[in-house]
């Protein structure tokens, strides 16, 4: 008799995706973050659903409803902080996942890579809208500043901004629609994740060496299910520690002040995971130029497969590009720090230099390093 998991139409799909999936035998712990992202997404949808049961998307009651969740709902504080810090975990895993793809040349599976970039944009949009919902000072002013950037679009900009706002300023209509979008987007993300996995399983996973591993594959279960469970346990340990010991560590104190359109906070800044892009936006004195740089800071990832000049896929055997890669990581950390600093000397010039370096490494230095390494190895 055939095993039911191999014959049942639905179980067959799950079997081919998570059980009998042929997987390279040498993938390292850097490959754990895909499954961790899946866990983060499930956690965010689950906690978000319970928060939505108690939240009200009205400007007069939104702030109070979040306070009510924390004070009066059973374990409401736990659900709220799991959701808020879960978003930070989500982005930590996302950045490592993208960084792994860049380091080991996984971007050569172009469909999977492009789907991942679309997912990154979708998650960033969801997180931005979620940050507006508690209706604190930073929620309100963050929404005002970021949506206002669209007014830089020639001719239709102002009309577009007012259309998104649902009026002449960020108000009740804006909050209601942001709540609606924040609720629906994670389910769209789930669908996109399925497409992402569909493309991935067409080609199979890459591995640290960047070489074809068809000759040496092992089943995903039990080897990598066990390995993923260890990753999940470590993720939960980190998340629970953050939630129970320092729940507001990554938040902004300004968001504990109810939104006030008449009082601007001294430093408007987004959550930590957007600071690198915010620093790039601020480093350009022109509004439209800044908006384009902001979008390109993520969209530039789509160019990476087309700028791959080396005959070796992974950076494992390419020390020159490896050095550039780690300079890029350091540069992103500098941009993150600059994004949280006030707009004054010396932070302005540091931000501008770091922004130029970010684009230069990806667009110029890495492709050049690939060609230099090929010529050193006499592979051209």
UniProtKB/Swiss-Prot annotation:
<keyword id="KW-0479">Metal-binding</keyword>
<keyword id="KW-0472">Membrane</keyword>
<dbReference type="InterPro" id="IPR036150">
    <property type="entry name" value="Cyt_b/b6_C_sf"/>
</dbReference>
<dbReference type="Pfam" id="PF00033">
    <property type="entry name" value="Cytochrome_B"/>
</dbReference>
<dbReference type="InterPro" id="IPR027387">
    <property type="entry name" value="Cytb/b6-like_sf"/>
</dbReference>
<dbReference type="InterPro" id="IPR048260">
    <property type="entry name" value="Cytochrome_b_C_euk/bac"/>
</dbReference>
<feature type="binding site" description="axial binding residue">
    <location>
        <position position="83"/>
    </location>
    <ligand>
        <name>heme b b562</name>
    </ligand>
</feature>
<feature type="transmembrane region" description="Helical">
    <location>
        <begin position="77"/>
        <end position="98"/>
    </location>
</feature>
<dbReference type="GO" id="GO:0045275">
    <property type="term" value="C:respiratory chain complex III"/>
</dbReference>
<feature type="binding site" description="axial binding residue">
    <location>
        <position position="97"/>
    </location>
    <ligand>
        <name>heme b b566</name>
    </ligand>
</feature>
<feature type="transmembrane region" description="Helical">
    <location>
        <begin position="113"/>
        <end position="133"/>
    </location>
</feature>
<keyword id="KW-1133">Transmembrane helix</keyword>
<keyword id="KW-0408">Iron</keyword>
<feature type="transmembrane region" description="Helical">
    <location>
        <begin position="347"/>
        <end position="367"/>
    </location>
</feature>
<comment type="subunit">
    <text>The cytochrome bc1 complex contains 11 subunits: 3 respiratory subunits (MT-CYB, CYC1 and UQCRFS1), 2 core proteins (UQCRC1 and UQCRC2) and 6 low-molecular weight proteins (UQCRH/QCR6, UQCRB/QCR7, UQCRQ/QCR8, UQCR10/QCR9, UQCR11/QCR10 and a cleavage product of UQCRFS1). This cytochrome bc1 complex then forms a dimer.</text>
</comment>
<feature type="binding site" description="axial binding residue">
    <location>
        <position position="196"/>
    </location>
    <ligand>
        <name>heme b b566</name>
    </ligand>
</feature>
<keyword id="KW-0813">Transport</keyword>
<dbReference type="GO" id="GO:0008121">
    <property type="term" value="F:ubiquinol-cytochrome-c reductase activity"/>
</dbReference>
<protein>
    <recommendedName>
        <fullName>Cytochrome b</fullName>
    </recommendedName>
</protein>
<dbReference type="InterPro" id="IPR030689">
    <property type="entry name" value="Cytochrome_b"/>
</dbReference>
<feature type="transmembrane region" description="Helical">
    <location>
        <begin position="178"/>
        <end position="198"/>
    </location>
</feature>
<feature type="binding site" description="axial binding residue">
    <location>
        <position position="182"/>
    </location>
    <ligand>
        <name>heme b b562</name>
    </ligand>
</feature>
<keyword id="KW-0830">Ubiquinone</keyword>
<feature type="transmembrane region" description="Helical">
    <location>
        <begin position="288"/>
        <end position="308"/>
    </location>
</feature>
<dbReference type="InterPro" id="IPR005798">
    <property type="entry name" value="Cyt_b/b6_C"/>
</dbReference>
<feature type="transmembrane region" description="Helical">
    <location>
        <begin position="226"/>
        <end position="246"/>
    </location>
</feature>
<feature type="binding site">
    <location>
        <position position="201"/>
    </location>
    <ligand>
        <name>a ubiquinone</name>
    </ligand>
</feature>
<keyword id="KW-0349">Heme</keyword>
<keyword id="KW-0999">Mitochondrion inner membrane</keyword>
<feature type="transmembrane region" description="Helical">
    <location>
        <begin position="33"/>
        <end position="53"/>
    </location>
</feature>
<keyword id="KW-0812">Transmembrane</keyword>
<dbReference type="GO" id="GO:0006122">
    <property type="term" value="P:mitochondrial electron transport, ubiquinol to cytochrome c"/>
</dbReference>
<dbReference type="GO" id="GO:0046872">
    <property type="term" value="F:metal ion binding"/>
</dbReference>
<comment type="function">
    <text>Component of the ubiquinol-cytochrome c reductase complex (complex III or cytochrome b-c1 complex) that is part of the mitochondrial respiratory chain. The b-c1 complex mediates electron transfer from ubiquinol to cytochrome c. Contributes to the generation of a proton gradient across the mitochondrial membrane that is then used for ATP synthesis.</text>
</comment>
<keyword id="KW-0496">Mitochondrion</keyword>
<dbReference type="InterPro" id="IPR016174">
    <property type="entry name" value="Di-haem_cyt_TM"/>
</dbReference>
<feature type="transmembrane region" description="Helical">
    <location>
        <begin position="320"/>
        <end position="340"/>
    </location>
</feature>
<keyword id="KW-0679">Respiratory chain</keyword>
<comment type="similarity">
    <text>Belongs to the cytochrome b family.</text>
</comment>
<keyword id="KW-0249">Electron transport</keyword>
<dbReference type="GO" id="GO:0005743">
    <property type="term" value="C:mitochondrial inner membrane"/>
</dbReference>
<dbReference type="Pfam" id="PF00032">
    <property type="entry name" value="Cytochrom_B_C"/>
</dbReference>
